[in-house]
Amino acid sequence: MRHTTLLSGIICLLCLLAACGDSHFMTDASYRSRVERDFQQKKTLMPQGDLFAIFDTSLSDYEREALEFLYAYMPLADIADYSGEFHLMNVRASRQAADEMPWGKRIPEDIFRHFVLPVRVNNEHLDSARVVFYKELKDRVKTLSLQDAILEVNHWCHEKAIYTPS
């Protein structure tokens, strides 16, 4: 009887852990399908080389979907000029910030997808500044509200650079 109860408990625990496993980057299945379709179209535009080799590596569902989103909508030059590992590093860095900051889980999925995950907004050079800035800022903002964290980042920026008109 004790063994049956123990075995049942282990099975329940395994089922629970399996259910709590990897999460989706995009929870809306229809939107996820649209991104997948757009990603496949992008792949057909660039069939030569190993530009999409990162997708042949071991990725979580979240990482795969986030990368597919980025690749589907990023400029072709960013796919050709930057490695998949670079883009994966940025996916992981953005998720780390969302997971570690107290307000990170409250950022709406579409806002995160379009304004946090992308490595750039316009045509600036891509680099690993996101990782460097996070290391420098996380302890300054981790106990603050989202609004106060935004203000603190502005203060930090003022400490680092001063605008001088040209």
Sequence positions of predicted segments:
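Secondary-structure boundary elements
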Residues: 80, 84-166
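Intrinsically disordered, low-complexity N-terminal segments that are enriched in acidic
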Residues: 20-98
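Positively charged, low-complexity intrinsically disordered regions
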Residues: 3-4, 33, 96, 131
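Generic signature of intrinsically disordered, low-complexity, basic-rich segments
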Residues: 1, 14-15, 62, 125, ...
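Residue-level detector of intrinsically disordered, flexible termini
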Residues: 17-18, 148
